[in-house]
């Protein structure tokens, strides 16, 4: 998708080709599911869903939260129930994908919207931490595994943030400072490094 100028172009490219995901089955015969978000610099969003080998594409600025299970339309139906119930009094609190989706949707709708980059990073990071599955969590459910990393982007300032749960820091790449022209040298970020400040 790095060949596309914006979300509509990426969606058109995906619709032109018969993309599939192939992979191993997991416990109890479950297959790989994937929800993949695309947002361009104008805030146009799309979500690409691979469900049982079939690609579904949903577009709209209301696509803000993604988890891998269940399929997107079912997830929205579950979320609609909780929106009507009201999250002020009760929110689902398990580590299941639907519960984490509902919490992410609720908090995104009820936090301050800010143009200040650092505050926006802090707010977004706090929501992502709230919907993460703790590292090393095990319960034997084939559909739940611990969160390995979290990522988000500031599309206005062209910064891509991510943290890996085994590294106590957070990384970001300032795409405005990267040479992304064809033929430019390959860049690599060593995510095993940490910085200590005393």
Predicted regions and their residues:
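C-terminus-biased signal that marks the final domain/tail of proteins
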Residues: 22-24, 31-32, 41, 64-198
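Structured, non-membrane catalytic/scaffold regions adjacent to prosthetic-group chemistry
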Residues: 1-60
């Amino acid at each position: 998708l790095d060949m596309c100028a914006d979300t509509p172009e990426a969606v058109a490219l995906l619709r032109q080709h018969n993309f599939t995901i192939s992979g191993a089955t997991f416990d109890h015969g479950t297959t790989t599911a994937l929800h993949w978000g695309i947002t361009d610099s104008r805030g146009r969003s799309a979500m690409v869903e691979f469900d049982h080998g079939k690609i579904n594409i949903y577009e709209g600025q209301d696509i803000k939260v993604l988890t891998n299970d269940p399929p997107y339309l079912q997830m929205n139906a579950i979320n609609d129930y909780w929106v009507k119930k009201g999250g002020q009094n009760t929110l689902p609190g398990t580590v299941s994908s639907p519960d984490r989706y509902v919490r992410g949707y609720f908090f995104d709708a009820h936090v301050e919207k800010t143009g200040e980059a650092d505050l926006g990073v802090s707010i977004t990071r706090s929501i992502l931490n709230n919907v993460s599955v703790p590292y090393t969590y095990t319960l034997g459910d084939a559909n739940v595994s611990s969160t390995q990393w979290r990522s988000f982007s500031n599309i206005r300032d062209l910064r891509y943030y991510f943290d890996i749960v085994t590294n106590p820091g957070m990384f970001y790449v300032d795409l405005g400072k990267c040479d992304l022209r064809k033929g430019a040298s390959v860049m690599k970020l060593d995510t095993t490094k940490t910085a200590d400040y005393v």
